């Protein structure tokens, strides 16, 4: 290990263990094509995708453990990571700690086995965007297709139906000033 890498590891209080399980942390906001600020805790998909490819090809790695504590983020980047996790030949386990919100839901269910601690939460909501809308009808159709990609992925990789997931996404009784549902650990398992 290079001296600078060793110093960084010690600074971050990371202990390297010799193991055949690849540990992947997805924390903060999932960053996509637009760069988030330096002060924003983020997982960058351009770092995660090559790491997953290396783990898949490394013969010394037998499986993958994904630790999730994310507020969500970029849909395209999140789905790209989720698709890559789901397509891996090596077994993968996801563990939701804290939160698996928004695009974190597909990331959680992409693994072969998905676990959530009782104190963790998952927020399910419709696709959102901000900024100016020029073509309202076209933008709506595009967002609807994007949401269909998400609900299709989640229902294909979990025990929840697409209809039930959409029902939870569009619930107006749970979140103040918003549409969607917040589920804690046990609820996330039961609702599916």
Segments (PLM) and residue ranges:
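Terminal-region recognition feature
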Residues: 1-192
């Amino acid at each position: 290990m290079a001296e600078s890498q060793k110093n960084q590891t010690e600074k971050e209080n990371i202990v390297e263990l010799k193991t055949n399980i690849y540990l992947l942390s997805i924390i903060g906001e999932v960053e996509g094509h637009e760069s988030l600020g330096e002060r924003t805790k983020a997982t960058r998909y351009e770092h995660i995708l090559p790491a997953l490819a290396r783990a898949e090809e490394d013969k010394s790695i037998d499986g993958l453990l994904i630790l999730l504590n994310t507020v969500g983020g970029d849909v395209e980047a999140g789905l790209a990571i989720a698709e890559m996790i789901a397509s891996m030949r090596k077994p993968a386990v996801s563990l939701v700690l804290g939160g698996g919100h928004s695009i974190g839901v597909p990331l959680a269910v992409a693994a072969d086995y998905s676990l959530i601690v009782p104190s963790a939460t998952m927020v399910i909501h419709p696709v959102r965007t901000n900024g100016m809308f020029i073509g309202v009808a076209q933008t709506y159709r595009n967002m609807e297709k994007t949401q269909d990609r998400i609900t299709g992925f989640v229902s294909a990789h979990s025990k929840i139906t697409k209809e039930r997931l959409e029902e939870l996404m569009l619930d107006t009784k749970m979140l103040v000033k918003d549409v969607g549902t917040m589920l804690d650990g046990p609820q996330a398992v039961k609702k599916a």
